[in-house]
Amino acid sequence: MSGIWHTDDVHLTSAGADFGNCIHAKPPVVVVPRTVADVQEALRYTAARNLSLAVRGSGHSTYGQCQADGGVVLDMKRFNTVHDVRSGQATIDAGVRWSDVVAATLSRQQTPPVLTDYLGTTVGGTLSVGGFGGSSHGFGLQTDNVDSLAVVTGSGDFRECSAVSNSELFDAVRGGLGQFGVIVNATIRLTAAHESVRQYKLQYSNLGVFLGDQLRAMSNRLFDHVQGRIRVDADGHLRYRLDLAKYFTPPRRPDDDALLSSLQYDSCAEYNSDVDYGDFINRMADQELDLRHTGEWFYPHPWASLLIPADKIEQFIETTSSSLTDDLGNSGLIMVYPIPTTPITAPFIPIPHCDTFFMLAVLRTASPGAEARMIASNRLLYEQARDVGGVAYAVNAVPMSPGDWCTHFGSRWQAIARAKRRFDPYRILAPGYRMSFD
C-alpha cells in the first residue's frame, strides 16, 4: 500500500481526538497520503472493507467531526504545498494551513478576501464547512471565494470541478461537510493587500445600540472588518465591544471622524491604533501560545455557532443570556456579527431565510469532565435558535440526530441525498457528523 499507514498507539490516539476534546474515537488506522493516488487507494481500501473514512486537516473540529470510530482517518498534512500565487488567484493543496497561505500571498502583496480568526486551520477544512470571518459582510464565506477544486470522490474518482465544469460536485463539496469527496487542491481568489490596519474598539452598554451599529457598519461598507464580542464583567453584567478595522497603505490614512461619525458608542477603548496587516490577520497567534502555555488549549472546547436572523438577534440574546454566558471563564467570549445573505452562494450551507443574519459563536473552555453540561446547554441554544428561524453553523459541539440533520438542511436534503448517492455511493465519508442516508 502506498502513502504512510500508521497503526501505532501514538498516531491512533492523536487521530482519535480533536481541538474540541469532547469526543474521542480512536481509529484502527491512520493514512497519510502523499499523492492523489494515495488518497484514491485509501478510499478504495475503506470501501472494500465496509469501513468509514474521515479527513483530518489540523484537527480543529469541536465534536469529533474529523474522527472515524472503527474506520480510517486520512491525515492530509503532506498535502502542504502552495503551488502558485499569481494576480488574483492562488493554487494550493488542501492540507496547507491558512497561515502559510497568507505568508505566500503577502509576499506578492495579495490576500484572500475572507480569513477566519484563527489561521491554524487548513484550506480543505474550512472550505468543507464554510469559513466565516470579519470581512464576510463584504465577501461572503471562504467557500464563496474559491474558483476551482480538485476532489477525489467517495468512489475514488479524481475530478476537477468549478462553477462551469462538474458544477454539481463543486457545489456539493463547498460547505458539504466532507460528505461527498476529499478536497486535495483548491484555486482561491485573492485581492490586493494593504500594508496597514487601523483598529477601532468601541465599547457599549446597550445591546440594541451595539447591534444597530454593527448593522450600520455592515451597510455603509466603510470598514473592512466588522466583529462584535460580548463578555461578562466581574459583576456579572454583559459588556459589548465592536471591533472595526480599516485597511490602508501609507501615506494615505483613514479619516477617523468620517468613519465613526454615524456610530453611537459609549467610548473607544482603542482608537487610532495602527498595526501591520500581516499581524492583524494573524492576531490569534499570541493568544494560542498563551493558551498552550496555561494548558487551556488542551481542555475541552464545547463551542456553539448559530446563525440568527437579524430581526431576532436582540431578543434571542436577551432571552438566552444566562445560557450564553454560563462558564465563559477568563478565556471565553461570545462573538456576534452581521452578514448579508446575498454573497453566500454555496447551496449546501443552510442560512436563515432573511436578508441579513448574525453569526453568534459561544466560545467556551471547560475543565476536563465539565463539558457535558455545556454540550447540553449548546443543544438547548440550538433548539431555541431553530425556533426563531435560526440554523446551526455545522462546526458545533451540538448533538445532532439523523432527523435533526434533515431539519437542518430542510429543502436541501433531497439534493444532498442525491449527491451522496452519486459521489459517495458506499457512504463511507465523514462519519463524525452522524448523518443517515438510509
Curated annotation (Swiss-Prot):
Protein name: Uncharacterized oxidoreductase ORF5 in fasciation locus
TM regions (residue ranges): none
InterPro entries: Cytok_DH_C_sf, Cytokinin_DH_FAD/cytokin-bd, FAD-bd_PCMH, FAD-bd_PCMH-like_sf, FAD-bd_PCMH_sub1, FAD-bd_PCMH_sub2, FAD-linked_Oxase-like_C, FAD-linked_Oxidoreductases_BP
Function: The FAS-operon encodes genes involved in cytokinin production and in host plant fasciation (leafy gall).
Entry keyword Endoplasmic reticulum: no
Pfam families per UniProt: Cytokin-bind, FAD_binding_4
Superkingdom of this protein's organism: Bacteria
Binding site for FAD: 55-61, 65, 117, 122, 128-132, 183, 393, 430-433
Organism: Rhodococcoides fascians (Rhodococcus fascians)
Cofactor (UniProt): FAD
Signal peptide: none
Domain FAD-binding PCMH-type: 23-193
